[in-house]
Curated annotation (Swiss-Prot):
SUPFAM superfamilies: Photosystem II antenna protein-like
Subunit structure and binding partners: PSII is composed of 1 copy each of membrane proteins PsbA, PsbB, PsbC, PsbD, PsbE, PsbF, PsbH, PsbI, PsbJ, PsbK, PsbL, PsbM, PsbT, PsbX, PsbY, PsbZ, Psb30/Ycf12, at least 3 peripheral proteins of the oxygen-evolving complex and a large number of cofactors. It forms dimeric complexes.
Transmembrane spans: 21-36, 101-115, 140-156, 203-218, 237-252, 457-472
Protein name (Swiss-Prot/TrEMBL): Photosystem II CP47 reaction center protein
GO cellular component: chloroplast thylakoid membrane; photosystem II
Key words, A-Z: Chlorophyll, Chloroplast, Chromophore, Membrane, Photosynthesis, Photosystem II, Plastid, Thylakoid, Transmembrane, Transmembrane helix
Cofactor: how and how many bound: Binds multiple chlorophylls. PSII binds additional chlorophylls, carotenoids and specific lipids.
Pfam families: PSII
Topology with respect to the bilayer: Multi-pass membrane protein
Covalent S-S links between cysteines: none
Protein purpose: One of the components of the core complex of photosystem II (PSII). It binds chlorophyll and helps catalyze the primary light-induced photochemical processes of PSII. PSII is a light-driven water:plastoquinone oxidoreductase, using light energy to abstract electrons from H(2)O, generating O(2) and a proton gradient subsequently used for ATP formation.
Length: 508
């Protein structure tokens, strides 16, 4: 046929059988990738430390999506929360991966069958004998079926009526587990961080889809609308489908980057805004203050801070710290977290407590500045020692650790104090193993960052695809160079004055 690569889809333009075939093959490829990727991730995933080496630190991409839908067990005998199990059941991580691969194989065979047997009676218009599709009817069928699936997911899977529920956690990502969720029918259901909204919105959207599907199955579009929107043209279907996909991609890019109940931090890692706003730092200080109010010592109060909460308050877990072109997991960047060293408290020789100013998200380097409780600079690590007034040596800064592995240990040696001041810029101080994976010390993004970048990029690309194909189908006659009134203009007797549409003759 000699088609250039960008014109190859014309082979399925007037061939419904093979149009169906290539879509089934596409589904086979998507399902096959999902299953294969899941098996690869399971082969490299280390479930031994869900607190300091969770799935998002290891760069897992499909495991978090399975987990948020209720899969927590592996045929390898482990549970995602760190426990061991004896009977994982069919729907384990491996079971879901295998189901996708089997489904992919069946779709592959179905695609071949439909490619070979393309000329089916169902695709022929009985009036003309030519291949044709009743697109408004097909639209109604798809709307109805997707509505049923949407309603079923919200009413059965999410609520636990017939299914496991979904991953639900507290606001600080500490107590997450799979559990049934009751639909939230009040105004709280519109809060993106309320899991009940997931159930209620799927039930509502599914109901709407079912009703809309039945409407489109029982009511034919008006002729003027049918012609105006080119409802008989398959490229109209392509254009509107692309619109649905790019809109969904923009939405999920937003819910992933800014966070929501659908993207728990235990599965995808924290958001950059939680670092920017000191979200975890505030909660840690609140807990310490509450402990002190109960007559606990500083050491006791800090020792009760969960290691998981402290780890969230570390800049290396901020998805905006990784460059777009730095490949690999977070563990390949700053290393595998081994343990929390504790919270460093700095004091000058007068005994005044000093706080290290934290590094903002978009800085790679940042001056080490220590301020007092009023925000006044009291110490720093100077760039030029000759002009320094507030150096650690001059001010006599010491550091003492509370909680963690170095609980109760203090240092007054300036070199050690400066080392921990630099590390305190990055949040809570952790021991990181960079040898095991030959980590290079350069921060990487989490799957939250990759997902957002990928979906925002493809959404933009698909937006232009929607405009392109929409314009092609709406202005098909213009692009083809054929004026639809051309025959009327040259037809003898169509107009009182030849070629003048304002003098059109009335039919007798």
């Amino acid at each position: 046929m000699g088609l250039p690569w960008y014109r190859v889809h014309t082979v399925v333009l007037n061939d419904p059988g093979r149009l169906l075939s290539v879509h089934i093959m596409h589904t086979a490829l998507v399902a096959g990738w999902a299953g294969s990727m899941a098996l690869y991730e399971l082969a490299v995933f280390d479930p031994s430390d869900p607190v300091l080496d969770p799935m998002w630190r290891q760069g897992m991409f499909v495991i978090p999506f399975m987990t948020r839908l209720g899969i927590t067990n592996s045929w390898g005998g482990w549970n995602i929360t760190g426990g061991t199990i004896t009977n994982p059941g069919l729907w384990s991580y491996e079971g879901v991966a295998g189901a996708h691969i089997v489904f992919s194989g069946l779709c592959f065979l179905a695609a071949i069958w439909h490619w070979v047997y393309w000329d089916l009676e169902i695709f022929c218009d009985e009036r003309t004998g030519k291949p044709s599709l009743d697109l408004p009817k097909i639209f109604g069928i798809h709307l109805f079926l997707s509505g049923v699936a949407c309603f079923g997911f919200g009413a059965f899977h999410v609520t636990g009526l017939y299914g496991p529920g979904i991953w639900v956690s507290d606001p600080y990502g500490l107590t997450g587990k799979v559990q049934p969720v009751n639909p939230a029918w009040g105004v709280e259901g519109f809060d993106p961080f309320v899991p009940g909204g997931i159930a209620s919105h799927h039930i509502a959207a599914g109901t709407l889809g079912i009703l809309a599907g039945l409407f489109h199955l029982s009511v034919r579009p008006p002729q003027r609308l049918y012609k105006g929107l080119r409802m008989g043209n398959i490229e109209t279907v392509l254009s509107s489908s692309i619109a649905a996909v790019f809109f969904a991609a923009f939405v999920v890019a937003g819910t992933m980057w800014y966070g929501s109940a659908t993207t728990p931090i235990e599965l995808f890692g924290p958001t950059r805004y939680q670092w920017d706003q000191g979200y975890f730092q505030q909660e840690i200080y609140r807990r310490v203050s509450a402990g002190l109010a109960e007559n606990q010592s500083l050491s006791e109060a800090w020792s009760k801070i969960p290691e998981k909460l402290a780890f969230y308050d570390y800049i290396g877990n901020n998805p905006a710290k990784g460059g777009l072109f730095r490949a690999g997991s977070m563990d390949n960047g700053d290393g595998i977290a081994v343990g929390w060293l504790g919270h460093p408290v700095f004091r000058n020789k007068e005994g005044r407590e000093l706080f290290v100013r934290r590094m903002p998200t978009f800085f790679e380097t940042f001056p080490v500045v220590l301020v007092d409780g009023d925000g006044i600079v009291r110490a720093d690590v100077p760039f030029r020692r000759a002009e320094s007034k507030y150096s650690v040596e001059q001010v006599g800064v010491t550091v003492e650790f509370y909680g963690g592995e170095l609980n109760g240990v203090s240092y007054s040696d300036p070199a050690t104090v400066k080392k921990y001041a630099r590390r305190a810029q990055l949040g809570e101080v952790f021991e990181l193993d960079r040898a095991t994976l030959k980590s290079d010390g350069v921060f990487r993004s989490s799957p939250r960052g990759w997902f957002t970048f990928g979906h925002a990029s493809f959404a933009l690309l698909f937006f232009f695809g929607h405009i392109w194909h929409g314009a092609r189908t709406l202005f098909r006659d213009v692009f083809a160079g054929i004026d639809p009134d051309l025959d009327a203009q040259v037809e003898f007797g169509a107009f009182q004055k030849l070629g003048d549409p304002t003098t059109k003759r009335q039919a007798v």
